[in-house]
Amino acid sequence: MKIFKTLSSILVTSVLSVTVIPSTFASTESTATNQTQQTVLFDNSHAQTAGAADWVIDGAFSDYADSMRKQGYQVKELEGESNISDQSLQQARVLVIPEANNPFKENEQKAIINFVKNGGSVIFISDHYNADRNLNRIDSSESMNGYRRGAYENMTKDMNNEEKNSNVMHNVKSSDWLSQNFGVRFRYNALGDINTQNIVSSKDSFGITKGVQSVSMHAGSTLAITDPNKAKGIIYMPEHLTHSQKWSHAVDQGIYNGGGINEGPYVAISKIGKGKAAFIGDSSLVEDRSPKYLREDNGKPKKTYDGFKEQDNGKLLNNLTTWLGKKESQSSMKDMGIKLDNKTPLLNFEQPENSIEPQKEP
């Protein structure tokens, strides 16, 4: 669901004072469990329900979670605050990270890398730039990339002492983490309502795009391929996008390279170590119309898209689940026997050290 930022400052305080839940996993897992089932773990420890977001397995991500159960997985949720660790990932086969509105701590980043290199799979689901649900100056693309736009040297730039010293910011260090480890970076663009048929063939996507003819976006971003030996794009935006097709609230030009391959992939995959990763530039592709929570700012029901059922979105996600669940011996895209991508052409302000914040946040 795409929102304009109308949350009050009360929400910032509430987010910074989240109480850590002693139990690592939530009790919302409803499928029968047994020792042979593998576990998909959904992160809900980085403000995944802030603002209009409702990215939980018994809320607006329930269709997605149910599709995984139908593939034989046990689906659980990771609650608390900044709870990703070697221990919390120990029993997981796949880690799903929807829109993280709080940044990852260094130990969490290390745990994710260890998890993937040792054979686990992770999927990062982000959104358009400026989708700052909890008004903490950091949106999901920035959290996942590892640095804040315009604050690469210091992620706490312009924060007051309460924000700087909060539990959320403790042990958070700015870096180009996602690109350095996975070979991709979420671009800070913002595209509008678009259906795309610009899809890589099944044979060049490890079967992920089989049966997928069209995929939708409702205000989202694309990614940059920064290391083709590690990462590959599989879904792209249409060619020749115009200014009118950017998100209406974009704070810059919104569309960076006119769409197509040069805009970077909307959906990408990566192979490192024994494991693998996937990346999606819009939560609307995944969500459904069954939000669980009310908005914190006004107490009204949240409104979400029925994206899982749109176009071939559900088919794509099912295929991604299948691919992420397979173990493979190759440790990079270079070893996978497919044609490698070219690096995505970047604008100067997209270099982390050259990035600027077009509009002060929040």
Where are these regions (language model features)?
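A glycine-centered loop/beta-turn motif at secondary-structure junctions
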Residues: 195-335
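Sec-dependent signal peptide cleavage junction
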Residues: 18-32
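Bacterial N-terminal signal peptides that target proteins for export
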Residues: 1-10
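Long alpha-helical segments found as membrane-embedded helices
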Residues: 29-167, 277, 282-287, 294-362
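Bacterial N-terminal signal peptides
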Residues: 10-19
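An acidic, glycine-rich "communication" segment
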Residues: 129-255
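Short alpha-helical segments and helix-capping/turn motifs at coil-helix boundaries
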Residues: 20, 108-109, 262-265
